[in-house]
């Protein structure tokens, strides 16, 4: 009964959204719309393949990759630090405060964080790195906290009963149980962040996104096509690398 009520509520919300926005699906999927979209896409070709622009694009790819990697790493460290009290290890008061902080961090989208960090530290990749780190810390911190709360208690309890210090109980009793989950969460967020990092450039956070915004603003469509292809290639490479790392982890 509960599932039926949820299904009815979701269906009503979707139907109400279509009615409120007055969407005309007939125009969206019409032949004229498809032909217009195709003509627009063809204006981007052929891509710009001059050596100077390809070198510039390669630098943008490296910058975007660095922003996503460093941002994810900083987020993992900050998220782990907040996940410890959020999991209830240090009492209910710190648990409530940490969860509130994690909710705040992840409820603000990356683009909003980027707009704020650009105002704080100026244009460039540092602003993008901070934006990714702050939002992703909220996401990873909550996931880490849930993993810690659901970790098996038996190994930690056995070490504690043997007189092991609390820090070592956590390191040798709890952390090995949740580390595979932590690594999986970090890799998945890195996959997501490589795409987000490419978009953050639209608000001045550096990388391929900033290049794309610049080229589109000048209607350099061939150059924009090259940047878009670089974005797709970078995302595919990161997805492949992440998949290989996960396979290696499972095979060990």
Write out the residue ranges for each language-model feature.
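N-terminal, non-cleaved signal-anchor transmembrane helix
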Residues: 1-73, 81, 85, 93, ...
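Loop-to-transmembrane-helix entry motif
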Residues: 48, 60, 64-72, 107-111, ...
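Hydrophobic positions within alpha-helical transmembrane segments of bacterial inner-membrane proteins
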Residues: 68, 72-80, 84, 88, ...
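Generic hydrophobic transmembrane alpha-helix motif, especially the helices
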Residues: 102-136
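Cytoplasmic-entry segments and transmembrane alpha-helices of multi-pass inner-membrane transporters
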Residues: 81-116, 143-146
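Membrane-cytosol interface at the C-terminal ends of specific transmembrane alpha-helices
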Residues: 123-174, 180-189, 240-243
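Alpha-helical membrane-interface segments at transmembrane helix boundaries
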Residues: 58-66, 98-105, 187, 191, ...
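C-terminal transmembrane helix and the adjacent membrane-cytosol boundary/short C-terminal tail
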Residues: 184, 225-252
């Amino acid at each position: 009964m509960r599932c039926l009520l949820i299904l009815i509520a979701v269906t009503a919300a979707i139907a109400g959204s279509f009615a409120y926005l007055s969407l005309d699906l007939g125009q969206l999927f019409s032949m004229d719309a498809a032909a217009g979209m195709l003509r627009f896409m063809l204006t981007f070709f052929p891509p710009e393949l001059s050596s100077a622009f390809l070198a510039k694009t390669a630098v943008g790819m490296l910058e975007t990759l660095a922003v996503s990697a460093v941002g994810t790493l900083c987020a993992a460290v900050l998220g782990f630090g907040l996940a410890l009290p959020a999991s209830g290890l240090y009492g209910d008061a710190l648990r409530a405060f940490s969860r509130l902080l994690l909710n705040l961090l992840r409820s603000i989208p990356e683009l909003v964080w980027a707009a704020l960090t650009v105002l704080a530290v100026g244009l460039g990749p540092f602003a993008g790195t901070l934006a990714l780190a702050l939002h992703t810390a909220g996401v990873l911190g909550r996931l880490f906290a849930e993993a810690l709360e659901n970790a098996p208690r038996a190994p930690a309890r056995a070490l504690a009963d043997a007189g092991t210090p609390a820090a070592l109980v956590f390191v040798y009793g709890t952390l090995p149980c949740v580390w595979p989950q932590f690594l999986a969460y970090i890799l998945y967020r890195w996959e997501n962040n490589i795409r987000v990092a490419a978009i953050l450039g639209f608000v001045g956070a550096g990388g391929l996104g900033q290049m794309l915004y610049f080229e589109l603003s000048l209607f350099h469509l061939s150059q924009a096509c090259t940047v878009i292809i670089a974005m797709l290639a970078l995302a595919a490479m990161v997805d492949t690398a992440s998949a290989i790392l996960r396979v290696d982890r499972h095979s060990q």
